[in-house]
Amino acid sequence: MNQLSAEMIKAGIVALAVFAGCAYDEPPPPAINVQQPAASLTGLLESVGARLSYRLDLPARHGKVPAVVIGHGSGRVTKDACRFLAAGFLARGFAALCYDKRGVGESTGEYSSVGPRNSDRMFEALGEDMAAGVRFLRSHDAIDEARIGLVGGSQAGWIIPVAAAKVKPAFMILLVGPTVSVGEEIFYSAIVEKTAAPLEDGYKRLPTVTGERGFDPRPLLETLDVPGLWLLGAKDRSIPTPETVMILDRLAAQGRPFSHVVFPEAGHDLSGSPYWEAIDRWLARTPTLGVALLGNTAVQRK
């Protein structure tokens, strides 16, 4: 058995730990004076093989409002895990839909940690859950069905393209979302996240990955015409940021409407980075979405 194969086996052994307890759960609290929702509605969403317990927070605005469906990172997470992202979008005039991950909290269905062998099946199911959220919002009287987006981080970076292919949202925002395969992410993080190895070691050795790759988002991303923003940390020890950027640049050169921002001092949690400012700038120049921010006094910088 060669050294690389041995490392891939080691990576497979730690895969459950990587995906069940990733350093990213959610970005830090938004740097805003957060308003409370004008209303919070709860209920159950029907998805394929699951019923999802949701909370829909609505802003204090007249008329139909834009909205986001917030997807989860790895682990057994509930709707409460997206509270900071929801608050940030609420302050920007968006409604925010959060839900318990399938098989977690009050949601039914199968929960499973994700690795290369089951990633295609699990991301199909989790993508269907996000798509169900979009379909629900499109039927809601308070929501502008033409301005519904998908938002999420880490593992959600794989799930969002699956959902986007199903329902064609108005936009997608992916925080520290990988564009490499599951197997490549595990290989990279096994080298640098669980050891003191320099990030450059992971970058240099990534092309030598062996073993199962599992889900790969690149074929889906090559087909998507959905405006997308990736927010990345240059010091991320979970996903290989340079490879992610290279893939996004290649896709943008092919005409995909994708942008990215790399924060030089940020890791996988984006802690200390001005990611909300980046989101604001991108939303303001994305057709039909910038209007959501106009005249919104809830967004006040500290």
Model-derived segments and spans:
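Hydrolase active-site cap/lid region
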Residues: 166-204
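Alpha/beta-hydrolase active-site loop
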Residues: 118-140
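Short alpha-helix in the alpha/beta-hydrolase fold that links the catalytic acid
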Residues: 226, 240-250
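The serine-hydrolase catalytic nucleophile loop
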Residues: 75-86, 101
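Short beta-strand/loop motif that positions the catalytic acidic residue
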Residues: 224, 230-232
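Catalytic active-site module of serine/aspartate enzymes centered on a nucleophile-bearing elbow/loop
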Residues: 266-302
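Conserved alpha/beta-hydrolase
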Residues: 90-110
